[in-house]
Curated annotation (Swiss-Prot):
The keyword tRNA processing does not apply. This is Heat shock protein 90. The TPR repeat-binding motif mediates interaction with TPR repeat-containing proteins. The keyword ATP-binding applies. It is found in: Cytoplasm. Belongs to the heat shock protein 90 family.
């Protein structure tokens, strides 16, 4: 046999081979989704040829009719799904069906192994392989206008064969033949196929035809009658018929007596999806079930949608739209390579393109749906769309309707909780990016607070609980609720009875940079300088006195720490902590610095000027600070002061959420303090080290005047 007959054999890419093995060797109850996936792929191929034909009409000369055809063959145990779409070249078959893994292949396998439903397969871009749920062999013949007809064949044994074929039926498009497994022949039944198409694919925008077997009555003569008929016909041909009277009528009666009726089987195509596009219908006439089915066919989701918005706009421009909020966020929602959104654009019921970036801002990329415009030209390109004023108006309306939809979701507390768990990052990204709708979006924010630790609260509810003398909204950003709740920064604010908002999502940092105020109340971080708490005259007086009293200590500490801090000041925010590190109002917070340091592709030049300018604030009421002041007042040149100040500073860095530049040095200071507390002298330590290593330890810095001041250290404790 020639190579053309044998074909070329290719190995499946490793991840695809693993996926197929998982599909074949694991039991799944809802195998019917294979048909939905194959029909969906056919629909995509038809979309592509129709879009191409808008600018190149000659592309349709190989077949003007666009449809999907399903043909079951019980005798051969095969099920064929054919479309007249764009087709695939030989290279497409090799790459798309085996040698190049889609980005979602690995993610889908991980999801499956974690217990996810097989019906999610379409969301990960690997729906074709679901064919192996019901087939032990799959043959794909495909004809692209730019290539000959090629056939892909595999029994999922780790490889596939590509060969050139001649298929007169396939002038353009793809024909997938599934060799159905012995225990899956139910999928060859017309009833079952109709049921699946109605359930999953009735809103596909192209005719789905099913080749059905039907019966009709046919009159046939018995054997004798057949012979007589032949003779009579022969005689009639030889002579002319002269009599047309009684004799003819008698002949006719005799003829009728000799005929019998039999059931004749024949095949014809039956269209399964005659429903007109759902978005063109009146919303009042559409049931929730119909919306759910359309959503599933549109999105490849296996769950119902969370909410829907169906509307039309008339006036200077006309368009209809149907928008859905899913139950859960897709696995790759914020991946850079992900298509921007899932909105399909139609012009006068003709599909133009999917994932139309210009229709929705990026923060609403989770919204799925269709937009059907009456005003855009049919042959519009992506480049023209970017300049289209019509599209800008449509986009503005869509965003407005999405916000209305979120309002409707918020009316049901449980539904909004589900929504917020999945899409809170999108809302916060919107606040960061969309200045026009920032105020409206802020109404959807929910946070845990010092007064509401079990249930999230809105900014509106926070404002309603504010004290009479409270003029600002207080918040703290951090890594976790536990960390911020026990932070030194919230001590006095909470002690005064003011509520503090806990922001623990990394994106909160970006969000709050843009959200400066809510309802006329300024948002203030309790970790930054300039925190003003309502105070009585007595408290103000005490604070001023403390500033004077500790002025000298602040100066000494600043001299010791030098460039490590911008300034040292008396604090009005601490209760039980001796000191803390606050940042300038316009620089990064400790949490933001942590986030930025974690960015693999960060701009290191930004770190220089945006990194927090650190201010050390001391608590004038804390015993450690009081004792330290006394020591400085007694002897400015006290050798232990420097080590104590550095240790206080480094500990404050850690408790304020910063990282240490030299953790080892800090650790050695702590160990040295422990030794002092245990009355271990330097000589004893050196002897112990020497007995083990034979060398004196020179890597750990000595505390200045440690031995002579060991007793005085205890006073500070």
């Amino acid at each position: 046999m020639s190579e053309e007959m044998n074909g070329e054999t290719f190995a499946f890419q490793a991840e695809i081979a693993q996926l197929m093995s998982l599909i074949i060797n694991t039991f799944y109850s809802n195998k019917e989704i294979f048909l939905r996936e194959l029909i969906s792929n056919s629909s995509d191929a038809l979309d592509k040829i129709r879009y191409q034909a808008l600018t190149e009409p000659a592309e349709l000369e190989t077949g003007k009719e666009l449809y999907i055809k399903i043909t079951p063959n019980k005798a051969d145990k095969t099920l064929t799904i054919m479309d007249t779409g764009i087709g695939m070249t030989k290279a497409d078959l090799v790459n798309n069906l085996g040698t190049i893994a889609k980005s979602g292949t690995k993610a889908f396998m991980e999801a499956l192994q974690a217990g996810a439903d097989i019906s999610m397969i379409g969301q990960f871009g690997v729906g074709f392989y679901s064919a192996f749920l019901v087939a032990d062999k799959v043959v794909v013949a495909s004809k692209h206008n730019d290539d000959d007809c090629y056939q892909w064949e595999s029994s999922a044994g780790g490889s596939f064969i590509i060969r050139q074929v001649n298929d007169p039926e396939l002038t353009r498009g793809t024909k997938i033949t599934l060799y159905i497994k012995e225990d899956q022949t139910d999928y060859l039944e017309e009833r079952r196929i109709k049921e699946i198409v109605k359930k999953h694919s009735q809103f596909i925008g192209y005719p789905i035809k099913l080749t059905v077997e039907k019966e009709r009555d046919k009159e046939v003569s018995d054997d004798e009658a057949e012979e007589e008929k032949k003779d009579e016909d022969k005689e009639k041909k030889e002579g002319e018929i002269e009599d047309v009277g009684e004799d003819e009528e008698e002949d006719k009666k005799d003829k009728d007596k000799k005929k019998k009726k039999i059931k004749e089987k024949y095949h014809e195509d039956e269209e399964l999806n005659k429903t007109k596009p759902i978005w063109t219908r009146n919303p009042d006439d559409i049931s929730n079930e119909e919306y759910a089915e359309f959503y599933k066919s549109l999105s490849n989701d296996w769950e119902d949608h969370l909410a829907v918005k169906h509307f039309s706009v008339e006036g200077q421009l006309e368009f209809r739209a149907l928008l859905f909020v899913p139950q859960r966020a897709p696995f790759d929602l914020f991946e850079n390579k992900k298509t921007k959104n899932a909105i399909k654009l139609y012009v006068r019921r003709v599909f133009i393109m999917e994932n139309c970036d210009e229709l929705m801002p990026e923060y609403l990329n989770f919204i799925k749906g269709v937009v059907d415009s009456e005003d855009l030209p049919l042959n519009i390109s992506r480049e023209m769309l970017q300049q289209s004023k019509i599209l800008k108006v449509i986009r503005k309306n869509l965003v407005k309707k999405c916000l209305e939809l979120f309002d409707e979701i918020a009316e049901d507390k449980d539904n909004f909780k589900k929504f917020y768990e999945q899409f809170s990052k999108n809302i916060k990204l919107g606040i960061h990016e969309d200045s026009t709708n920032r105020k409206k979006l802020s109404e959807f924010l929910r946070f845990y607070t010092s007064a509401s630790s079990e249930e999230m609260t809105s900014l509106k509810d926070y404002v309603s609980r504010m004290k009479e003398n409270q003029k600002q909204i207080y918040f703290i950003t951090g890594e976790s609720r536990e960390a911020v709740a026990s932070s030194a920064f919230v001590e006095r604010v909470k002690r005064r009875g003011f509520e503090v908002i806990y922001m623990t999502d990394p994106i909160d940092e970006y969000c709050v940079q843009q959200l400066k105020e809510y309802d006329g109340k300024k948002l203030v971080s309790v970790t930054k300088e300039g925190l003003e708490l309502p105070e009585s005259e007595e408290e103000k007086k005490k604070f001023e006195e403390d500033k004077v009293k500790f002025e000298n200590l602040c100066k000494v500490m600043k001299d010791i720490l030098e460039k490590k801090v911008e300034k040292v000041a008396v604090s009005n925010r601490l209760v039980s902590s001796p000191c803390c590190i606050v940042t300038s109002e316009y620089g990064w917070s400790a949490n933001m610095e942590r986030i930025m340091k974690a960015q693999a592709l960060r701009d290191s030049s930004t770190m220089g000027y945006m990194a927090a300018k650190k201010h050390l604030e001391i608590n004038p009421d804390h015993s450690v600070i009081k004792a330290l002041r006394e020591r400085v007042e007694a002897d400015k040149n006290d050798k232990t002061v420097k080590d104590l100040v550095v240790l206080l500073f480094e500990t404050a860095l850690l408790s304020s959420g910063f990282s240490l530049e030299d953790p080892q040095l800090h650790a050695s200071r702590i160990y040295r303090m422990i030794k002092l507390g245990l009355d271990i002298t330097e000589d004893e330590e050196e002897e112990a080290i020497a007995s083990v290593s034979g060398e004196k330890d020179e890597c750990v810095p000595n505390l200045v005047g440690a031995e002579e001041d060991a007793s005085r250290m205890e006073e500070v404790d």
